[in-house]
Structures are given as C-alpha cells and as structure tokens.
C-alpha cells in the first residue's frame, strides 16, 4: 500500500464513511470530453444512478458512491465523435467504460431509452458495445 494511504482504513457507519471520503485528498477519476456537459452528465447519472456531485458549463463530476473515484465530464468545443468500429484515419476512441449488469437485454433497452445507440458491429457474445450521447463507446456485459 502506498505510504500516503496507510492508516486510512475507513471505520464507522456507512454515513460517517461517506462524509469522511469527501475530506480525502487521493481522489482519481476518468474524464470524458463532450460538446455538452449537461447531456452527458445526466446520461451517466441516470444510467448508473450516480448523483451529479459538481456541475457547471465547463464540467461535471459524478459521485460513484464509494471509495475515491469519480466520473468527470469536461466541455470540449472541438470534440470529435469517435467512430465505431475503429477506422484508419478517423477519430479513434481513447478509452471505454465497462459495466457489469444482471439482465443484459433490459439494460440495453434502458440505455437506449436514455439516449445510447446500439451499433451494428458487436465483437463478442455476452457483451454489447453501445455509444453514449457524445459517441463514446461503452460496454454492458454479464
């Protein structure tokens, strides 16, 4: 364990641990670029049930509920939507998010109702690649 994290065992009730985590200084996150922060923040908030912790027109952070991780959305007016599947000479995805689900078909339908797209190209069974409203690929799997 890194020295700066030693002794940071979380004790107390769930509520005490949740409040205490906001005092920590070892946060890390994944940040997605988007032309419209609000649209993408609301999509992931509704998809995963993560509250929007901070939001303004330049960015947002979603509270994942445990630990010290967050999902960030930052406005990028020059954002170029990636293509899926990847194509030479075209904007490539930089990364993607994976979410394990219990009922794959139900979660695909729910994601699409929230604004996701289901592309024709699907590389494997038990996993579905979808595109969020900004075009970022993400996977749902069982």
Indicate where each model-derived feature is located.
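N-terminal beta-strand motif that seeds the catalytic metal site of vicinal oxygen chelate
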Residues: 2-42, 94-101, 141
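Conserved short beta-strand elements that form part of the metal-binding/catalytic scaffold
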Residues: 4, 51-91, 137-142
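A generic local structural motif
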Residues: 17-18, 82-85, 115
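Core segments of cupin and vicinal oxygen chelate
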Residues: 20-75, 107-109, 113-121, 125-129
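Long, low-complexity, intrinsically disordered polar/charged segments
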Residues: 43-46, 80-101
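Conserved Rossmann-like nucleotide-cofactor binding loop
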Residues: 102, 136
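Short, acidic, Ser/Thr-enriched surface-loop or helix-capping motifs
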Residues: 132
């Amino acid at each position: 364990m890194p020295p700066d994290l030693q002794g940071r065992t979380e004790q107390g009730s769930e509520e005490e641990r949740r409040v205490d985590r906001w005092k920590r200084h070892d946060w890390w996150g994944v940040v997605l670029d988007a032309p419209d922060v609000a649209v993408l923040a609301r999509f992931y908030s509704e998809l995963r049930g993560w509250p929007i912790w901070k939001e303004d027109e330049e960015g947002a952070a979603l509270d994942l509920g445990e630990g010290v991780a967050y999902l960030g959305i930052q406005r990028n007016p020059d954002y170029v939507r990636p293509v899926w599947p990847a194509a030479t000479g075209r904007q490539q995805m930089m990364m993607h998010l994976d979410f394990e689900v219990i009922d794959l078909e139900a979660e695909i339908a729910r994601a699409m109702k929230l604004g996701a797209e289901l592309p024709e190209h699907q590389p494997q069974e038990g996993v579905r690649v979808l595109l969020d409203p900004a075009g970022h690929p993400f996977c749902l799997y069982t």
